[in-house]
Amino acid sequence: MVVKTVRVLNRAGVHARPAALIVQAASRFDSKIMLVRDTIRVNAKSIMGVMAMAAGCGSELELVVEGPDEVAALSAIERLFQNKFEEE
């Protein structure tokens, strides 16, 4: 299992488009991928779950990945956050 804290850097937060990018990236991997914000824990492969987090700009999320391709999965999703979901 690998765990990393990521921060939402884009101004609009995790709305529909960034949520779709997260789900699309997560779905390419066999690992179980969870996003955690405060007491909310969601499957990163679920568009409704990711959007329900309502993570605004500046929010910190814990990315928890467990499985055979966990390092690659963590890296791919972390890159989305670092690149502000290519919105800015």
Curated annotation (Swiss-Prot):
Activity regulation (UniProt): Phosphorylation on Ser-46 inhibits the phosphoryl transfer from enzyme I to HPr.
CC per GO annotation: cytoplasm
Phosphoserine: residues carrying this PTM: S46
Keywords: Cytoplasm, Phosphoprotein, Phosphotransferase system, Sugar transport, Transport
Transport in keyword set: yes
Active site: H15
SUPFAM superfamilies named in the record: HPr-like (SSF55594)
PROSITE patterns for this protein: PTS_HPR_DOM, PTS_HPR_HIS, PTS_HPR_SER
Similarity remark: Belongs to the HPr family.
NCBIfam families for the chain: PTS_HPr_family
Name this polypeptide is given: Phosphocarrier protein HPr
Gene: ptsH
